[in-house]
C-alpha cells in the first residue's frame, strides 16, 4: 500500500523528526519500505484568489485572470475554461520552480502573464485517477485558505510516497491509523485517534436481515461528508481513483482505518434491508457469478458491492455499511471482475472485528469534527473485541528466543511501549492488541518485543568455529532413475473432494486459496501420481514408473512411487534399496485402499507409509503405489550393523529350496518370510509363483544359498 510520509508524521506527531529517521524507524519496526517516491519537484507556489476574468482580445483561447496574492495582485493568462471569479487557485509565480524550470513573467499575445495557474497533474498526480471536476482545467476551490500560508505545507504537497509491503498476516497494517500508532509508540509521542470507546447521537431504526455467512455492521449518518482538498490529495497519493462524494468518503475510511465500506441510502418509510446471495451478470460477459445483494423491503436491489453503487443524495441521511464478507466469495468476485482495487484487496484479507472498531472510533472523531450527527453502531457490540485471548508470559523463554540478556527494567520499559499499541499485561500473562490477527503464540509476542526494544541492540556474536564436514551425497535420484522411475512435480494444494488420506493425517484449513481445485493441503502424493499415470495411459503410454518427493499435510515430507510395471513385491525391494531399514508390512485397513492388495509400512512399530493399490472405487486397479513418510523415518535411528568379518572364499555351487505358503486371502507373507530371512547367509528370496485355490493364497518362494541354508530350511520344515 502507498502511504504519505507527511500524513504519517502529522498523525503520529513526528514533525520534529527528519524524514529519513521516520523511514528508518518503519524499517526497524518490520515494515518493508519497497520504494520511496517524491510527489513532485516544485517550490515557490502560492495561493491566489481570482478577482476578475477577462478574455485576451488577441487570442482565441486565453483568459486574463487578475489574481490577488499575499504580496500583490498579478495578472496570469490561462487556457483553462473552469476559472471562476472569487474562487481560489494555486499558481507558479515568478521565481517558482518545477523541476529545472524557473517561472518568469512572460508576454503572451500582447499581454504580460506573471506566472501560471496549476492543475492537479502539475502537482504530481496521475491524470487517470482524476474525476471530471479535477481534470477539467486548473485547480479551483472555495476561498478557505490564508493567502499567506504555504500550499506545499497546508496541502501536504512537499511529500514522499512510501510503497510499504505488508506481511499477509498484518491486514490491520493497511491503515494510516495503525501505522501512525506504531510510529508514535516507537518515538514515544502522543497518539489518540484509536480510542477505546464508541458512541452515537441517536439509535437507528434500521434492521439488517442477513441471509449469508458474512458479518454486516453499519452506521447511520445524517449527511454525506465532503472531504477536504488535502484529503482528496491523500486518496490520489494512495492511487485511489477520485469519484463522487460517497465513493471518496468510503475510500478515505478504507485507507485511514483498513475497513472496507459502502454507502447505502433508503427512502424515509423504509426500515429494513436484506442481504442475500444471488447471481449477477455484467455487460459483455457471458458468465454469471453469485454475489451479495442488499435489497429493500420490496426485494429490489439497492446495492451490489463491487458491481453497482447507489447514488447518494448529498444532504440526506445514509448508512455506511461495513462488511466482513466470506473470503472465498470475495476471491471469486475478484477473479470474475478481473479487478484489483484497494477495497477488494482488503476485503480478501482476514481482518478482524478490531479493524471495524477502529473505523467506528475514527468516525466518531471525524464526524463530530464535521458537526454531522451519527447513530450508535448497528449490529456491532463492544463485546466482539472484549473477548481477549491470554497467553502465558515467560521472560526466560523471551531471553532465549531473542538471544539477549534483558534486565527487568528493559522488559518493563518495552512492555509499556507495547501497551500503547494495545497489549495488556498482568504478572503471568498478556493479551495482544484487539485488532491484530497475527499474535497466536509466545514467539509472536517476542517478535513484537524485539521490534520496539530495538533491532540495533542485537549484539554482534562471534561465530563458533566448526570443523568443515562434507555432506553425504544424495544418491536417491540416481537410484530411482536407475530403477526406471521418472520424477514428477505437483501442486501442494488439492481440492477437498480429491484429498486422498490413507495415513489419516491432519491438515490446516486454509482461509484463502487460489481456486476451488486447490483448497486443501494434500494428505498424500499418491493421488496426483495416479492422475498423472492415467493421463499418460490415455496417451497410449502403458509402461509407467513415476516418483515424487514433496511436502504433505502435518509438515510431513514424503516420497511416493507409482508404477504399472512393478509389482508390490518389486516396490518393497526398491524401498530396501533406497533406505536400508528393517521395515514391517501389515495388512491395511483403510477406506482409501484395496484391503486385499495393500499393506501399511511400519518401522519400530511406527506407521511410516503404505504399499499396494488404491480402493476399487477410484478406478486405478492396474497401478501399484508405495508412499513413505521420510520425516518420520528420519526420526528413527538406524540400528548399527555388526562388525564386518571376512571369510575364505567359498566356490561351491549355490543351491535352492522352493517353499509354498498357504495363506487366507487377507493374510500377507511378510511375517513368515521374516522368520526364514533370519537364517544366516541367504543369498536371495524370490517370488516364483502365486495362485488362488479354494479361496487360499498359494505363494511359492525360491530361497537360494549355500548348503547350510538348505540344511536349515529342511530342518525347519521337518
From Swiss-Prot:
GO terms for cellular component: cytoplasm. Disulfide bonds: none annotated. It comes from the Bacteria. Binds 2 magnesium ions per tetramer. Its EC number is 6.1.1.20. Its cofactor is Mg(2+). It catalyses: tRNA(Phe) + L-phenylalanine + ATP = L-phenylalanyl-tRNA(Phe) + AMP + diphosphate + H(+). Residues 39-153 form the tRNA-binding domain. Residues 386-460 form the B5 domain. The keyword Acyltransferase does not apply. Tetramer of two alpha and two beta subunits. Belongs to the phenylalanyl-tRNA synthetase beta subunit family. Type 1 subfamily. NCBIfam families: PRK00629.5-1, PRK00629.5-4. This is Phenylalanine--tRNA ligase beta subunit. It comes from Mesomycoplasma hyopneumoniae (strain J / ATCC 25934 / NCTC 10110) (Mycoplasma hyopneumoniae). The gene is pheT.
Amino acid at each position: 500500500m502507498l502511504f504519505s510520509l507527511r500524513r504519517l508524521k502529522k498523525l503520529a506527531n513526528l514533525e520534529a523528526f527528519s524524514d529519513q529517521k521516520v523511514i528508518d524507524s518503519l524499517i526497524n519496526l518490520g515494515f518493508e519500505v519497497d520504494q520511496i517516491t517524491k510527489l513532485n519537484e516544485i517550490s515557490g507556489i502560492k495561493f491566489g484568489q481570482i478577482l476578475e476574468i477577462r478574455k485576451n482580445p488577441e487570442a482565441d483561447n486565453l483568459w486574463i485572470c487578475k489574481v490577488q496574492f499575499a504580496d500583490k495582485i498579478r495578472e496570469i493568462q490561462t487556457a483553462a475554461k473552469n476559472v471562476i471569479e472569487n474562487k481560489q487557485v494555486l499558481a507558479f509565480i515568478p521565481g517558482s520552480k518545477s523541476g529545472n524550470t524557473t517561472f518568469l513573467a512572460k508576454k503572451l499575445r500582447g499581454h504580460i502573464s506573471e506566472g501560471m495557474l496549476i492543475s492537479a497533474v502539475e502537482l504530481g498526480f496521475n491524470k487517470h485517477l482524476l474525476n471530471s471536476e479535477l481534470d477539467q482545467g486548473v485547480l479551483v476551490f472555495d476561498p478557505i485558505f490564508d493567502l499567506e500560508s504555504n500550499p506545499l505545507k497546508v496541502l501536504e504537497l512537499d511529500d514522499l510516497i512510501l510503497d510499504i509491503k505488508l506481511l499477509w498476516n498484518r491486514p490491520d497494517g493497511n491503515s494510516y491509523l495503525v501505522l501512525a500508532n506504531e510510529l508514535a509508540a516507537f518515538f514515544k509521542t502522543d497518539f489518540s485517534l484509536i480510542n477505546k470507546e464508541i458512541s452515537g447521537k441517536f439509535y437507528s431504526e434500521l434492521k439488517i436481515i442477513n441471509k449469508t455467512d458474512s458479518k454486516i455492521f453499519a452506521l447511520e449518518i445524517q449527511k454525506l461528508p465532503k472531504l477536504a482538498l488535502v484529503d482528496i490529495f491523500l486518496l490520489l497519493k494512495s492511487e485511489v481513483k477520485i469519484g463522487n462524494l460517497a465513493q471518496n468518503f468510503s475510500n478515505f475510511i478504507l485507507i485511514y482505518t483498513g475497513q472496507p465500506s459502502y454507502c447505502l441510502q433508503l427512502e424515509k418509510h423504509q426500515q429494513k434491508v436484506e442481504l442475500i446471495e444471488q447471481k449477477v451478470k455484467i455487460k459483455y460477459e457471458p458468465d454469471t457469478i453469485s454475489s451479495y445483494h442488499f435489497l429493500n423491503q420490496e426485494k429490489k436491489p439497492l446495492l451490489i458491492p463491487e458491481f453497482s453503487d447507489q447514488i447518494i443524495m448529498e444532504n440526506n441521511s445514509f448508512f455506511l455499511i461495513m462488511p466482513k464478507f466470506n473470503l472465498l466469495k470475495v476471491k471469486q468476485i475478484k477473479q470474475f471482475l478481473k479487478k484489483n482495487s484497494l477495497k477488494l484487496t482488503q476485503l480478501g484479507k482476514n481482518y478482524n472485528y478490531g479493524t471495524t472498531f477502529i473505523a467506528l472510533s475514527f468516525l466518531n472523531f471525524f464526524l463530530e469534527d464535521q458537526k454531522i450527527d451519527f447513530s450508535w453502531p448497528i449490529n456491532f457490540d463492544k463485546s466482539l473485541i472484549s473477548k481477549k485471548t491470554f497467553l502465558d508470559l515467560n521472560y526466560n523463554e523471551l531471553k532465549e528466543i531473542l538471544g539477549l540478556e534483558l534486565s527487568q527494567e528493559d522488559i518493563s520499559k518495552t512492555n509499556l511501549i507495547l501497551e500503547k499499541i494495545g497489549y495488556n499485561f498482568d504478572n503471568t500473562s498478556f493479551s495482544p492488541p484487539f485488532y491484530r490477527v497475527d499474535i497466536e503464540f509466545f514467539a509472536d509476542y517476542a517478535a513484537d518485543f524485539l521490534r520496539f526494544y530495538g533491532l540495533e541492540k542485537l549484539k554482534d556474536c562471534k561465530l563458533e568455529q566448526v570443523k568443515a564436514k562434507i555432506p553425504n551425497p544424495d544418491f536417491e535420484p540416481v537410484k530411482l532413475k536407475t530403477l526406471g522411475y521418472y520424477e514428477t512435480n505437483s501442486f501442494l494444494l488439492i481440492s477437498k473432494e480429491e484429498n486422498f488420506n490413507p495415513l489419516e493425517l491432519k491438515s490446516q484449513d486454509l482461509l484463502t486459496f487460489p481456486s476451488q481445485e486447490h483448497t486443501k493441503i494434500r494428505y498424500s502424493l499418491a493421488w496426483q501420481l495416479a492422475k498423472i499415470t492415467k493421463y499418460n495411459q490415455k496417451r497410449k503410454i502403458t509402461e509407467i514408473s513415476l516418483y515424487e518427493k514433496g511436502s504433505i499435510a502435518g509438515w510431513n515430507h514424503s516420497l511416493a512411487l507409482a508404477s504399472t510395471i512393478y509389482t508390490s513385491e518389486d516396490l518393497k525391494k526398491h524401498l530396501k534399496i533406497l533406505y536400508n531399514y528393517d521395515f514391517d508390512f501389515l495388512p491395511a485397513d483403510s477406506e482409501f485402499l484395496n484391503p486385499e492388495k495393500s499393506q501399511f509400512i511400519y518401522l519400530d512399530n511406527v506407521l511410516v507409509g503404505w504399499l499396494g493399490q488404491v480402493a476399487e472405487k477410484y478406478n486405478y486397479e492396474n497401478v501399484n503405489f508405495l508412499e513413505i513418510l521420510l520425516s518420520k523415518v528420519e526420526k528413527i535411528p538406524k540400528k548399527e550393523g555388526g562388525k564386518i568379518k571376512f571369510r575364505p572364499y567359498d566356490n561351491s555351487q549355490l543351491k535352492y529350496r522352493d517353499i509354498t505358503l498357504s495363506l487366507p486371502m487377507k493374510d500377507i507373507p511378510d511375517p513368515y518370510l521374516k522368520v526364514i530371512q533370519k537364517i544366516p547367509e541367504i543369498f536371495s528370496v524370490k517370488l516364483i509363483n502365486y495362485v488362488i485355490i479354494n479361496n487360499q493364497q498359494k505363494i511359492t518362494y525360491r530361497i537360494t544359498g549355500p548348503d547350510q541354508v538348505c540344511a536349515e530350511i529342511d530342518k525347519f520344515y521337518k
